[in-house]
């Protein structure tokens, strides 16, 4: 799918919860522990802990969302580095705020009762937690409706 010519209509940052912030400290703790072991003379212990710090830090940096974006023909979840998840409007049924418990692909960054669910026509829904759920859903559904209207007018299905 090529989305490079799309216009960005709205974007929101994820709101990070306390638990996730504490989890993000783990690589730093491993790094400090590795440094402490090295300075205390335990080089092998330091070298054993260092890869864990680097790998866990890299994984966290790559998979945690940076931005949730609404384009004129798709939604994009920007992850670390060059990675992102793009869902075209042709694959989306609706975007809604929900509190239901269900099996979803999660790009949530906090534990909360209400989250935004991107309901797909086929496959698993996607759960996200933007800073402002209401505004994100409003913009996403407005863009989805406009895209559907344009598709009907041009005869593309």
What are these regions (language model features)?
Residues 78-135, 155-157:
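Non-transmembrane, membrane-adjacent beta-strand/coil modules in membrane-associated proteins
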Residues 52-89:
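Conserved beta-hairpin
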Residues 1-39, 113-117, 121-125, 157:
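N-terminal membrane-targeting/pre-transmembrane regions
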Residues 41-53:
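Hydrophobic alpha-helical transmembrane segments
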Residues 145-157:
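Cytosol-/stroma-facing membrane-proximal "stalk/adaptor" domains immediately downstream
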Residues 35-42, 60-63:
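Transmembrane helix-loop junctions and nearby membrane-interface residues
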């Amino acid at each position: 799918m090529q989305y490079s010519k799309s216009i960005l209509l709205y974007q929101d940052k994820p709101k990070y919860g306390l638990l996730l912030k504490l989890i993000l400290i783990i690589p730093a703790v491993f790094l400090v522990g590795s440094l402490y072991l090295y300075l205390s003379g335990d080089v092998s212990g330091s070298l054993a802990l260092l890869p864990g710090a680097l790998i866990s830090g890299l994984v966290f940096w790559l998979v945690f969302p940076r931005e949730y974006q609404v384009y004129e023909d798709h939604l994009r979840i920007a992850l670390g580095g060059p990675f992102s998840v793009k869902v075209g409007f042709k694959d989306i049924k609706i975007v809604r705020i929900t509190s239901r418990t269900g099996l979803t692909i999660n790009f949530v960054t906090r534990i909360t009762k209400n989250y935004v669910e991107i309901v797909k026509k086929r496959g698993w829904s996607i759960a996200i937690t933007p800073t402002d759920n209401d505004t994100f859903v409003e913009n996403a559904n407005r863009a989805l409706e406009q895209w559907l209207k344009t598709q009907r007018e041009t005869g593309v299905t």
